[in-house]
C-alpha cells in the first residue's frame, strides 16, 4: 500500500508517517537544483563521461530524479548513460508523483513517463528504463540500511536526502551512512540539505 500523504495549502506534500515536508519552502525543483545538482557539481562534472551513476537516499516524490533527468536532457555534454539509484522504504502512490510535478513544464512530461512505470513496487529491486535505455532508474524498496548493504552499487554522485534527522533518524544513522559510503569511490561527491551536527559527525566517521 502507498504511504499516506497530506497536501498543505501551499501545495507542498507532507508525510503523515514522519511528520515532515517532502521538500523545503523554496520548492522541490529549486532545492534539487541548488542543493543536489549544484552541490555535486552537476551537470559540469559529468561532461563527456560515458556514464554517470547517482545514488540517492530517499526517493520520495521522485523530484530529484526528475530534475536530474531534465538536466541530462538539456545538456549537450551529457553522458551517454545516466543511472540513478535510489532507496525508499515507503513509496508514495503514482498519482502523488504526478501531483508533485504538476504545473512544472520541465518536470511534468517526465513525471508522466515515470508514472507509467511506477507500479507493483513490492520490497526488492526494480529497474525502470527511459530514453531508449539511456536513462535507468533503479529503485530498491525497503529499509535503506539493508538495501544499501545488499547492493553492489558504485556512485559518482550521492544525494543524501530524506526527512529531517529528528523525524527519520534511521536513514541518517551511522550504519546507514557507512553502507552508503561503501558505494562511493575516490572522487565521489556528496550533497545534502541538512547541516545537523550528528550527520556531519557520522559522515566524518565514514571517511
Protein language model regions, located:
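Short beta->alpha hinge that forms the Motif I/post-I loop of the SAM-binding pocket
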Residues: 89, 172, 195
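A short glycine-rich, Lys/Arg-flanked "PGG" loop and its adjoining helix->strand segment in the class I
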Residues: 170-187
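Glycine-rich SAM-binding Motif I of class I
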Residues: 61-66
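A short helix->loop->beta-strand "cap" motif at the edges of active sites that frequently abuts
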Residues: 79-82, 184-188
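Conserved Class I S-adenosyl-L-methionine
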Residues: 105, 109-111, 197-207
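Short SAM/SAH-binding signature in class I
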Residues: 137-139, 153-162
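S-adenosyl-L-methionine
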Residues: 98-151
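Rossmann-like AdoMet
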Residues: 1-53, 69-109
